[in-house]
C-alpha cells in the first residue's frame, strides 16, 4: 500500500475524522495516483502555513500518493518589485510582466522553488525542482501583448515529470516557461 505503517496513519488521522478502515480503502483505491497541488505565494511567506504545507506533502508522499507541486510567488514578487521601484499592475488578475520585472519574477519563483525542495528534504521527502533553468517542462506563447512577458502553456513535457517521479521524488514546478526563442515568461500558477 504505502511507505507508512498503520500506527503512523492512526497518528495522522484527526480525532473526530474517519476511521482507519475508511482511510485504508481510500488509500488502496488511489495509491500511486498523481495529486497536483497548487500552492499560492501567500502560503510560502507565512512560516507556519509553509511548515504545514511541507508536512502535508510529506504525509501524502509517505501514504504512497504522488504529489506534484506547482507554486506561485505573488506577495514576495510584489514586495521585490516595490523594493526595486517597479509598480505592479494587473489585468484580469494577471500580473503585467514587463522587461524590467521579468528577471525579478524569475528570481523570486526560482528562489521559492529551491526553498520548497530544501524544506521537503529536511522533512524526509525528496523534491526535485523544475524551473525554466533546470528541467524546463513548460513551453509557452505570449498570453496577450498588454500583459508583456506572461505566457500561456502550449506544451508540457510530461516525460521530465515521469523521470522525476520514477526516482521517488516530488516534482516542484515554478510557473515559468520558455517560448520558441527561449524567452522566459511568467505563467499564472493556476493555469501552469
PLM regions: where:
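Nucleotide/pyrophosphate-binding catalytic subdomain
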Residues: 1-192
Amino acid at each position: 500500500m504505502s511507505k507508512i505503517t498503520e500506527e503512523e496513519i492512526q497518528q495522522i488521522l484527526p480525532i473526530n475524522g474517519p476511521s482507519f478502515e475508511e482511510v485504508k480503502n481510500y488509500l488502496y483505491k488511489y495509491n500511486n495516483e498523481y495529486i497536483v497541488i497548487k500552492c499560492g505565494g501567500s502560503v510560502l511567506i507565512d512560516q507556519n502555513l509553509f511548515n504545514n504545507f511541507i508536512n502535508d506533502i510529506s504525509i501524502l508522499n509517505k501514504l504512497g500518493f504522488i504529489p506534484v507541486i506547482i507554486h506561485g510567488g505573488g506577495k514576495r514578487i510584489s514586495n521585490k518589485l516595490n523594493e526595486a521601484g517597479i509598480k505592479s499592475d494587473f489585468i484580469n488578475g494577471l500580473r503585467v510582466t514587463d522587461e524590467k520585472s521579468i528577471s525579478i519574477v524569475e528570481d523570486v519563483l526560482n528562489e521559492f522553488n529551491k526553498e520548497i525542495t530544501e524544506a521537503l528534504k529536511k522533512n524526509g521527502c525528496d523534491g526535485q525542482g523544475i524551473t525554466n533553468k533546470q528541467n524546463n517542462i513548460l513551453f509557452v506563447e505570449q498570453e496577450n501583448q498588454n500583459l508583456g512577458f506572461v505566457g500561456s502553456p502550449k506544451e508540457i513535457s510530461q516525460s521530465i515529470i515521469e523521470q522525476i517521479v520514477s526516482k521517488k521524488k516530488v516534482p516542484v514546478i515554478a510557473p515559468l516557461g520558455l517560448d520558441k526563442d527561449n524567452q522566459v515568461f511568467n505563467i499564472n500558477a493556476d493555469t501552469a
